[in-house]
């Protein structure tokens, strides 16, 4: 019989915090210039008219207007902002 207590290292504590990715302003909604539209890893959604892209592939609005999601090519989504008349 062992007389020493078995000491094991913890196997928990490796979970990373969620990165809060995804669409922040949906199609048909109104946005202001500079609003973040989509946070993503890679270009799941591509920038369309009046939309800029950050170094971490975040899409943001360049003007105030209405957000539009379109699929121009096979499996390629574009996010645009249209001026409200």
From Swiss-Prot:
The cross-references to SUPFAM superfamilies, in alphabetical order and at most eight, read: Ribosomal L27 protein-like
Instruction: Tell me which PROSITE patterns the record gives.
Output: RIBOSOMAL_L27
Does this UniProt record's set of keywords contain Ribosomal protein? yes
**Which keywords label this protein?**
Ribonucleoprotein, Ribosomal protein
- Asked if the record carries the keyword Ribonucleoprotein, the reply is yes
GO-annotated cellular components? cytosolic large ribosomal subunit
Q: From its record, what is one biological process in GO terms?
A: translation
Name-wise, this protein is Large ribosomal subunit protein bL27
